[in-house]
């Protein structure tokens, strides 16, 4: 099996759908020799900020000298982004080897017993195999969906459990209230862990978190809002201070400062040999594609893959403080199963011109339908179904001193980012 065959095998499991539960991943891990056992894990759940918080934690641990694994989703441009070691993507041959081990376990052990893992379960198991083989000092695991029944939750009690911002999303699976969603996220809270929570949490979510920690007998740490100060912020980065520790952050948006403070408390909760210098260096090293990513400075081109109301609020806040003085062209694709109006009413009013397109995935909303929805908030809307053609048109409509904002979907962000980088090269 080569790398492409490994990825094809993983994607072939998509037909088995998304089926929450720990039975299948448990059987798969047992067939693989329990590779998740013995790993020192930082487990990160939440609605928004999971990927960035996980990445910052991973970068800090690396700067402190620890060999660190990182498991995140979704990927933007390359499938191998999902499994990383010391800041680098898993090598193609290593992905092939780990997925081959998973495939053999499925075909020789699970399938004969009528057990069929899902796509996410298979890639989670491959990550466990990889981290075990690499001898990671720590592994940072981002939850895929929810927490309680997510395949990453097959682990024993993590060293630290982290809960990022919790809000309404994936309501068909997780529940239709913040309390129900928080309950699912709090499934990662287990006796014997340190728990850290994002500071600006919905109070209803906080109540659920506090209750879960009390029941598990775990200490809950929340960054002290009074010790957070943003010193300077621009399109190009942020300088901030938390609890006497000054740091530079290249992930855009004030919410990223709060994610960084959450990460600081998470690594402190490990009680490991991690200096303030390593923390500052790790935060400065953290980068993530398609999170208010600045692709071009002039004209400004920003790329954001967030898709729910919380993400829309972060994008709107950033636009309002750093881009609103420019004429803005917005290029967007949204998934039909998301709260489309909730997203659009926050971001579309900033657009002088709104271009609706359709990312190349079945769940994507039709471009014409998105255009009609956006017309409630922007007077100048058009639909161009092809993302490549939409990008070409959008770029023709933006000149120096103006801004193009691509937003609403990681699928679109991946397509556009690849096109932009190819164009720039």
Identify the residue ranges that each predicted region occupies.
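Hydrophobic alpha-helical packing residues
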Residues: 57-62, 131, 374, 420
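Beta-strand->loop->alpha-helix junctions that form or flank phosphate-binding loops
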Residues: 72, 197-200, 212-234, 249-254, ...
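Acidic, Mg2+-coordinating active-site environments of NTP-dependent enzymes
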Residues: 110-112, 122, 134-142, 158-250, ...
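ATP-dependent carboxylate-amine ligase catalytic core
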Residues: 22, 29, 34-37, 63-156, ...
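Active-site-proximal loop/hinge segments that shape catalytic or ion-binding/gating pockets
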Residues: 409
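Nucleotide phosphate-binding/pyrophosphate-handling subdomain across enzymes
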Residues: 38, 133-134, 138-141, 149-162, ...
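N-terminal leader/targeting and accessory segments in enzymes
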Residues: 1-48, 52-67, 76-78, 194-211
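C-terminal helical cap/extension that packs against the catalytic core
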Residues: 200-221, 236, 268, 300-301, ...
């Amino acid at each position: 099996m080569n790398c492409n065959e490994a990825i094809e095998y993983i994607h072939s499991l998509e037909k088995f759908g998304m089926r929450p539960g720990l039975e299948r991943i448990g059987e798969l891990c047992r067939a693989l020799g329990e590779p998740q056992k013995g790993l020192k894990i930082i487990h990160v759940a939440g609605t928004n900020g999971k990927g960035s918080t996980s990445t910052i934690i991973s970068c800090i641990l690396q700067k402190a000298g620890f060999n660190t694994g990182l498991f995140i989703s979704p990927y933007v441009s390359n499938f191998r982004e999902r499994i990383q070691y010391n800041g680098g993507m898993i090598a193609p041959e290593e992905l092939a080897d780990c997925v081959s081990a998973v495939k053999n376990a499925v075909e020789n052990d699970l399938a004969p017993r009528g057990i069929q893992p899902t796509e996410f379960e298979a890639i989670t198991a491959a990550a466990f195999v990889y981290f075990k083989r690499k001898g990671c000092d720590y592994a940072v695991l981002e939850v895929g969906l929810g927490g309680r029944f997510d395949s990453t939750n097959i682990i024993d009690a993590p060293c630290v459990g982290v809960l990022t911002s919790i809000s309404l999303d994936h309501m068909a699976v997780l529940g239709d209230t913040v309390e129900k969603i928080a309950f699912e996220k709090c499934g990662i809270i287990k006796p014997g862990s340190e728990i850290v929570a994002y500071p600006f949490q919905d109070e209803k979510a906080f109540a659920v978190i506090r209750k879960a920690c009390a029941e598990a007998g775990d200490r809950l740490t929340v960054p002290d809002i009074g010790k957070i100060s943003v010193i300077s912020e621009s399109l190009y980065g942020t300088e901030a201070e938390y609890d006497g520790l000054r740091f530079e952050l290249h992930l855009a948006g004030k919410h990223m400062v709060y994610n960084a403070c959450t990460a600081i408390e998470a690594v402190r909760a490990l009680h490991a040999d991690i200096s303030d210098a390593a923390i500052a260096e790790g935060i400065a090293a953290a980068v993530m594609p398609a999170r208010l990513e600045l692709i071009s400075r002039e004209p400004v081109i920003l790329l954001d893959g967030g898709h729910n109301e919380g993400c829309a609020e972060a994008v709107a806040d950033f636009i309002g403080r750093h881009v609103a003085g420019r004429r803005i062209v917005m290029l967007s694709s949204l998934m039909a199963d998301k709260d489309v109006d909730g997203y659009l009413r926050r971001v579309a009013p900033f657009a002088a011109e709104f271009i609706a397109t359709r990312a190349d995935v079945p769940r994507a909303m039709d471009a014409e339908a998105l255009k009609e929805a956006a017309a409630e908030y922007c007077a100048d809307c058009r639909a161009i179904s092809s993302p490549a053609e939409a990008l070409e048109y959008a770029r023709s409509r933006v000149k120096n001193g103006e801004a193009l904002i691509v937003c609403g979907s990681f699928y679109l962000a991946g397509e556009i980012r690849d096109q932009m980088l190819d164009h720039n090269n």
